[in-house]
Amino acid sequence: MDASTINSLFLIGALLVGASILVSSLSSRLGIPILVIILAVGMLAGVDGGGIIFNNYPTAYLVGNLALAVILLDGGLRTRVASFRVALWPALSLATVGVMITTALTGLVAAWLFDLSLIQGLLIGAIVGSTDAAAVFSLLGGKGLNERVTATLEIESGSNDPMAVFLTVTLIDMIASGQTGLHWSLLGHLLREFGIGGLLGLGGGWLMLQLVNRINLAGGLYPILVIAGGLAVFSLTNALHGSGFLAVYLCGLVLGNKPIRSRHGILHMLDGMAWLAQIGMFLVLGLLVTPHDLLPIALPALGLALWMILIARPLSVVAALLPFKAFHGREKAFISWVGLRGAVPIILAVFPLMAGLPDAQLFFNLAFFIVLVSLLVQGTSLPWMAKLLKVTVPPDPAPISRSALEVHITSEWELFVYRLGAEKWCIGAALRELKMPEGTRIAALFRGEQLLHPSGSTVLEVGDMLCVIGHEHNLPALGKLFSQAPQRGLDLRFFGDFVLEGDAELGAVAALYGLKLDGLDAKMPLAQFIRQKVGGAPVVGDQVEWHGTIWTVATMDGNKIQKVGVRFPEGTRPGPGLFL
């Protein structure tokens, strides 16, 4: 390869990445997921478009694995362990039982539609059996979903790859060796994948945490060290026949939930690297496919995709979540719909090609077609389905920027910046009138380009920018303090007519609103009653019905319900005798 060829590759790569970024701005306007647009750019530049011929499957496998490792590391860093209280076991059930059921149901129909053997059909089911972390993390961000749904989908997508990889590799070996039956030893291999992946992921994350916090480096080197460490954990786990995907996700989880030096620098760079990984991966996968090869299989492939989306995924979700009573029908329906397929199935479809199996090209084309349908149908309709199934909650207003104040190696102090618009309720109020959360301080106030020295008598005006020092756990309270009037109206419509304290006694609430206790303990706190009615760990937005009234969890403090909203039937007035 001469210098001219290398330069041409650089130019083509830069143009494709740049075009993907520029065209992605159409995503919000057209309502199409960014990943579909990037995939389309790759396809248009490929053999049936721009004429770029790319059929190097080992290179695609390399790029895909590298990209997924970075994406999962970033996803783990941003996942809060607190979300495990509501989603860990349901997500693991989906990642194991759910994947197996989806594989079986999809495989049976694939074998029938394409006249394949049962083992070949199951291989197709295994290839497309897992949801994709890149697609889930990308499309769920900023949608305002309740914590139970978001955490379940994110943990599932980060942990279901071991099952899909295990089933795919096992079925490929069976086809290559002519086996037709399953053996109990396969269960041991599966447990090894999860066990080694879990141990090395948690252990590697702990070692990386100690290293980052004990060594003095230039600020820009910490993110690179974390990425290098994550890739080392990923590759070492794969070398020991564990799940590298699970390991790198858990490594990020450990790093993201402990005090770590240069946290914001690490997160900021990982965000950019994760985007670059997604762009590069989907461009390569778009280049890899030959669009005209998809046309002959379009109708049966569409039928298989719809079967998986409308039948196989919902049945697997219902079965996997059957033991977990806290999930409402609406939440199960939404989780069923967000079985997003992305890069993982396409990468797994490369395995049969590299193994030289018969019909391997058909498997690859089918996987690509199903991913395309999943992203277009499920990804595009995600916001609409979230509203239809009522799994969203009003988001807390966020600061326009936040940055770390590294006064200590493990300091968690941050600087939050809020801009006061005309609709802010605190306009015209003096600073002393603001009930700031305990432990927070207003550090500066900007008016136009002028820096003011804030005092208790300083009156806030439209356009003022407040710089507040606090911790991450202060954000909900600060968000309420600097909330907008329209947002408060939305909160009232969502949470109900009144908001009560969670520690209010049930007897007092019943007397106030004229409700019958029906043998319930009058001393029981309202929060405890709601928790019992939910049937599991509650989250903001959970709703229960009692005597025709709707009770909604409004705020949480860890596992504790702080406030509960109550909505009365239309046309009624709350008060004694209402339900007597």
Curated annotation (Swiss-Prot):
Predominant subcellular localization, coarse grouping: membrane
Cellular location(s): Cell inner membrane
Topology versus the membrane: Multi-pass membrane protein
Gene Ontology biological process terms in this record: cell volume homeostasis
TM helices/strands, residue ranges: 6-26, 34-54, 57-77, 86-106, 108-128, 162-182, 193-213, 217-237, 240-260, 269-289, 292-312, 334-354, 362-382
GO CC list: plasma membrane
Catalysed reaction, written as an equation: K(+)(in) + H(+)(out) = K(+)(out) + H(+)(in)
InterPro entries attached to this UniProt entry: Cation/H_exchanger_TM, FAD-bd_PCMH-like_sf, FAD-bd_PCMH_sub2, Na+/solute_symporter_sf, NhaP2, RCK_C, RCK_C_sf, Transptr-assoc_dom
Gene3D superfamilies attached to this UniProt entry: 1.20.1530.20, 3.30.465.10, Regulator of K+ conductance, C-terminal domain (3.30.70.1450)
Occurrences of domain RCK C-terminal (ranges): 402-484
Protein name (record): K(+)/H(+) antiporter NhaP2
Organism: Pseudomonas putida (strain W619)
